[in-house]
């Protein structure tokens, strides 16, 4: 890849948003790897951050998530100096790897969009393991506003929820379960 295309980290601007792509998989061979950002990329990203006007919107795209909600909201060690470098900016992480779809506030001014797989659960199941259908995340910038929407393949964009009745979800047999693909902590949920 590097020989033909160049570094595995780079940046570009689209509209008023600055996008940074980082390689946060350090491969050791024999299917062994670490989920971290190496020091060379961290230095490069910090230098890039210093050139941006205060309050800029920045999206950092990388494979593994910056925060692992299933491990008590543990933040990737190398993501901490990255967030510090972009302090004072509107920072969004766009990540994958987990086969689920979620949006988390990591800290003030930092949101992570962990996007489910477009292939579902590794091609053999059209639903990711958290109930999100196979699809993709659409990020939009319009009039200075930034928004995101999950698009499930083969269904209308307005469909953003799947419901299971009591007895259909083994982990919660007495409950009705709702999976809203793109819920985030800023939504207001109203039960009727």
Residue ranges of predicted features:
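Extended active-site neighborhood of metal-dependent phosphoesterases/phosphodiesterases
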Residues: 1-54, 73-94, 100-142, 146-149
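Short beta-strand/turn micro-motifs composed of small residues
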Residues: 23, 62, 180
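Short acidic, glycine-rich surface-loop motifs adjacent to enzyme active sites
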Residues: 49-70
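Active-site glycine-centered loops adjacent to acidic/histidine catalytic or metal-binding residues
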Residues: 63, 96-97
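Alpha-helix capping/helix-boundary segments
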Residues: 66, 99-100
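Short, compositionally biased P/S/T/A/G/V-rich stretches that sit at domain boundaries
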Residues: 142-174
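Short edge beta-strand/loop segments characteristic of extracellular beta-sandwich folds
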Residues: 174-183
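Short beta-strand elements bearing conserved aromatic residues within extracellular beta-rich modules
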Residues: 188-191
């Amino acid at each position: 890849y590097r020989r033909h295309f160049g570094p595995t980290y780079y940046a570009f601007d689209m509209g008023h948003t600055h996008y940074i792509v980082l390689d946060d998989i350090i491969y050791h061979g024999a299917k062994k790897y670490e989920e971290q950002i190496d020091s060379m990329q961290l230095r490069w990203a910090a230098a890039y951050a210093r050139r941006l006007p205060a309050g800029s919107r920045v999206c950092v795209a990388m494979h593994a998530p910056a925060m692992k909600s299933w491990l008590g909201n543990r933040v990737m060690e190398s993501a901490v100096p990255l967030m510090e470098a972009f302090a004072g900016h509107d920072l969004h992480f766009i990540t994958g790897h987990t086969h689920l779809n979620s949006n988390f506030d990591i800290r003030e001014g930092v949101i992570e969009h962990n996007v489910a797989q477009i292939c579902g659960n590794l091609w053999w199941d059209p639903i990711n393991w958290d109930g999100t259908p196979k699809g993709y995340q659409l990020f939009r910038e319009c009039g200075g506003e930034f928004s995101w929407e999950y698009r499930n393949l083969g269904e209308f964009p307005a469909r953003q929820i799947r419901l299971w009745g009591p007895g259909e979800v083994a982990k919660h047999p007495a409950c009705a379960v709702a999976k809203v693909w793109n819920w985030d902590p800023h939504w207001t949920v109203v039960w009727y």
